[in-house]
UniProtKB/Swiss-Prot annotation:
GO cellular component: cytoplasm; membrane
InterPro entries registered for this protein in UniProt: FabA_FabZ, FabZ, HotDog_dom_sf
Physiological role: Involved in unsaturated fatty acids biosynthesis. Catalyzes the dehydration of short chain beta-hydroxyacyl-ACPs and long chain saturated and unsaturated beta-hydroxyacyl-ACPs.
Family classification: Belongs to the thioester dehydratase family. FabZ subfamily.
Full protein name: 3-hydroxyacyl-[acyl-carrier-protein] dehydratase FabZ
Localization annotation: Cytoplasm
Amino acid sequence: MNESIDINQIFTLLPHRYPFILVDRVIDYKVMEYLIAIKNVTINENFFTGHFPGNPIMPGVLMLEALAQASGILANLSRQPKEGYEFLHYFAGIDNARFKQVVIPGDQLRLEVRLVGQKRDFWRMHGEAYIGDKLACSADLLSATKEIKK
C-alpha cells in the first residue's frame, strides 16, 4: 500500500480544476497495476442544480468521468514525461458501461481502476465505482496520451 495522495498532489497529476475535478483523494495504488480513489459527493456539486431538482442524482456520465480521471492519475503515476513536458490523457473510448446504483449527496464514491493493457500511447483500463460495497458503475476505458510542453 502506498501513501495516500491528497487533492494538492492530484492537481499536479491532472489538468482538471473546479468544477470538473472528480477525484478528491487517492487511497491506494500500485504503478502499472491499479488505483483506488474517492470522490465525496456533496449537495454543493453544481450538477445537482438541474439533475434533478428535488431529487438530486449524480449523472452517470460524471461517474464515468470520475473513473476516467482516476485512470489518468494511474497512468501519470506509472510513467514519466521528458524534461519540461507533461502528459495529457484524452478519453478515447468506452465499452461495457453499466449503471447499477444511483449516487446522491452524502455518498462517498470509491473509484477502482485496473490497468488491462498499455501499448505506446494507449491505455486500456477497467473501472468500477462503489458506494460502500454496492457497485454503482463499471466500464472499460480507453485513453490516448499526448506529451505536451509545460
